[in-house]
């Protein structure tokens, strides 16, 4: 076999760089153990900052499943029917907030009639008496404890009764009535005297008319 002649390096040839690995003579570059050339390492230069984490297959699968399970954002379409909860679940879940007035009034009626639960707090004495005694045997309300009201005390006077003051107004009314009757009689007498004078004048005129 013919040997290939090695061409000696020219005088103007480029001197091998210090960064490029080579053998002891510096003529032949050494092969990289990792199989990556120098150009590849130069292109994969490390940038600034912390390198991003490598995403594993399990995390990607979990993210995909989470996206699939979550509710789609935005307004739902019109033709898609919304999921209606079953009656058993809706009845089991208690609504939050204050109950409606209709339910409150119904509860009050049941407690007032005695069919529902017992009232809260200490019951009144009248209610206790009404509950113990049947409705047919109730004759009068239960007697209350304590001092009687002022109205009942005033109805039973303790001191000597005062003289009746109704006699004085009656006497004043009688005197006023007498004065009015006397004035009326006086006016009637005056009117009768005037009428008498008018009658006598008319008689005189008639006599004069007959004499002519």
Swiss-Prot record:
- Segments of the chain annotated as binding DNA: 45-56, 70-79, 94-98, 118-127
Question: Could you confirm whether the keyword Glycoprotein appears in this record?
Answer: no
Main localisation: nucleus
SMART domains documented for this protein: AT_hook
- UniProt feature, compositional bias: Polar residues: 27-44, 57-72
The answer to whether UniProt assigns keyword Coiled coil to this entry is: yes
Its cellular-component GO annotations read: nucleus
The chain's coiled-coil residues are 176-210
Bias class Low complexity marks the residues at 103-113
What's an example of a GO molecular-function annotation for this chain? DNA binding
Q: Which InterPro entries match?
A: AT_hook_DNA-bd_motif (IPR017956)
Q: Where is this protein localized, as stated in its record?
A: Nucleus
* Keyword terms: Coiled coil, DNA-binding, Nucleus, Repeat
Task: List every stretch annotated Disordered.
Answer: 1-130
Give the protein's function: May bind DNA.
Q: What is this protein called?
A: Putative DNA-binding protein At1g48610
Q: What is the lineage of its organism?
A: Eukaryota, Viridiplantae, Streptophyta, Embryophyta, Tracheophyta
């Amino acid at each position: 076999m013919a040997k290939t002649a090695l061409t000696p390096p020219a005088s103007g040839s480029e001197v091998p760089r210090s960064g490029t690995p080579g053998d002891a003579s510096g003529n032949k570059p050494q092969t990289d153990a990792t199989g990556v050339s120098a150009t590849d390492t130069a292109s994969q230069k490390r940038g600034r900052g912390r390198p991003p984490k490598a995403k594993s297959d399990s995390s990607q699968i979990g993210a995909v499943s989470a996206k699939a399970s979550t509710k789609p954002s935005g307004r739902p379409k019109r033709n898609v029917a919304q999921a209606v909860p079953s009656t058993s679940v809706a009845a089991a879940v208690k609504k939050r907030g204050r109950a409606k007035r209709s339910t409150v009034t119904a509860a009050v009626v049941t407690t007032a009639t005695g069919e529902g639960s017992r009232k809260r707090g200490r019951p009144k004495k009248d209610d206790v008496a009404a509950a113990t005694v049947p409705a047919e045997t109730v004759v009068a309300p239960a007697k209350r404890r304590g001092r009687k009201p002022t109205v009942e005390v005033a109805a039973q006077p303790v001191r000597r009764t005062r003289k009746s003051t109704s006699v004085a107004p009656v006497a004043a009314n009688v005197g006023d009535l007498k004065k009015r009757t006397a004035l009326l009689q006086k006016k009637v007498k005056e009117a009768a005297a005037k009428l008498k004078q008018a009658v006598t004048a008319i008689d005189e005129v008639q006599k004069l008319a007959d004499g002519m």
